[in-house]
Amino acid sequence: MTSLFSESETEIVSTTYMFLTQDEMKGKAGTLNQPINDFLSLTKKFESSLKEEIKGQKGLIVKKIKKELESNSEKRKAALQMIKEEHTAKVDRYKMIIEDLRQQDVTLTYRKKKPVKDV
């Protein structure tokens, strides 16, 4: 019995494969920051209510409340703003990691048999 194929030769094919569809991650940081935004909104309402309550009043306790309110308000806003910025930075970092993992170099090595010419 004669074979229709002679010796085989090795072939190599290399390519870059995109495993996942691209995701812009739009809204991810917004979703993370929504509870913080809600907290800021509630804090503003509380501060407004407290200021309205002590409006026109005098005394050491009222002065202390006003001073603490202003001091803590600024610290709280700065801390929450920093957390929001960290969320955005982490989403950007996550996006970069996903992009790096999404694209992979693939190399296929196979043997290709040559057909015999004079059969």
UniProtKB/Swiss-Prot annotation:
Alphabetical keyword list: Coiled coil
Domain of life: Bacteria
Coiled coil location: 63-104
Protein name in the entry: Uncharacterized protein YvzA
Organism: Bacillus subtilis (strain 168)
Native organism taxonomy: Bacteria, Bacillati, Bacillota, Bacilli, Bacillales
